């Protein structure tokens, strides 16, 4: 019984990995059909549906992975790092690095892969970015308490500016067909971004 569950879990992971790889390839710029995905995995469409009731559920699982990966790591940064600017830098670098390491998933983060899918999926990505922006805002609000001095500009404005930088770099990565990596020249870009945090 345990072997059967493990085999099923492995097949589910194989399906999700194939979907992510297809999103990374030139197929990712077009609608991915279950027929193409089944061919990529080497199974029938019926076999896909034994593991996932719909393609939407496959995307849900990938979004869940993105959420878990980013939110868990953000929480670790907040636990380990106490300096506000360092926290913000690490969170931004985390988002950009995650996108760079997972190009197929970056198409999901930018909404590019979801254009042909249910609106609810884009809503989940929107919620994820709202959560991250709220976290950035909270980090900024805690600065006064932690360091005795807050920002002169509104934290809501600053947090949205930081997130817009991340989204822009991820979009550039997708638009360039993954040529311009989000972390390229980060050490030169960060002082420009950090200078806005007043």
UniProtKB/Swiss-Prot annotation:
Keyword Cell division: yes
Record key words, sorted: Cell cycle, Cell division, Coiled coil, Cytoplasm, DNA-binding
Any one GO cellular component localisation term in the record: bacterial nucleoid
A GO biological-process term: negative regulation of division septum assembly
Residue ranges occupied by any HTH tetR-type domain in the UniProt entry: 10-70
Coiled-coil segments: 117-145
Signal peptide range in chain numbering: none
Superkingdom of origin organism: Bacteria
Family assignment from sequence similarity: Belongs to the nucleoid occlusion factor SlmA family.
Entry function: Required for nucleoid occlusion (NO) phenomenon, which prevents Z-ring formation and cell division over the nucleoid. Acts as a DNA-associated cell division inhibitor that binds simultaneously chromosomal DNA and FtsZ, and disrupts the assembly of FtsZ polymers. SlmA-DNA-binding sequences (SBS) are dispersed on non-Ter regions of the chromosome, preventing FtsZ polymerization at these regions.
NCBIfam families: PRK09480.1
Subunit record text: Homodimer. Interacts with FtsZ.
Descriptive protein name: Nucleoid occlusion factor SlmA
């Amino acid at each position: 019984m345990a072997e059967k569950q493990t085999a099923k879990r492995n097949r589910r992971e194989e399906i999700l990995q194939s979907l992510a790889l297809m999103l990374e390839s030139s197929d990712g710029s077009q609608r991915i059909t279950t027929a193409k995905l089944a061919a990529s995995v080497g199974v029938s469409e019926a076999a896909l549906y034994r593991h996932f009731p719909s393609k939407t559920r496959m995307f849900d699982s990938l979004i869940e992975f993105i959420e878990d990966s980013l939110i868990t790591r953000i929480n670790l940064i907040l636990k380990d790092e106490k300096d506000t600017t360092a926290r913000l830098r690490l969170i931004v670098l985390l988002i950009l690095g995650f996108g760079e390491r997972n190009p197929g998933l970056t198409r999901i983060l930018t909404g590019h892969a979801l254009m042909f899918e249910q609106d609810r999926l884009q809503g989940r990505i929107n919620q994820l970015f709202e959560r991250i922006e709220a976290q950035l805002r909270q980090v900024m609000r805690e600065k006064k308490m932690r360091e005795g001095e807050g920002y002169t500009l509104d934290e809501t404005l600053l947090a949205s500016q930081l997130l817009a930088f991340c989204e822009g770099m991820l979009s550039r990565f997708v638009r360039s067909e993954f040529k311009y990596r989000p972390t390229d020249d980060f050490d030169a870009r960060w002082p420009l971004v950090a200078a806005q945090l007043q």
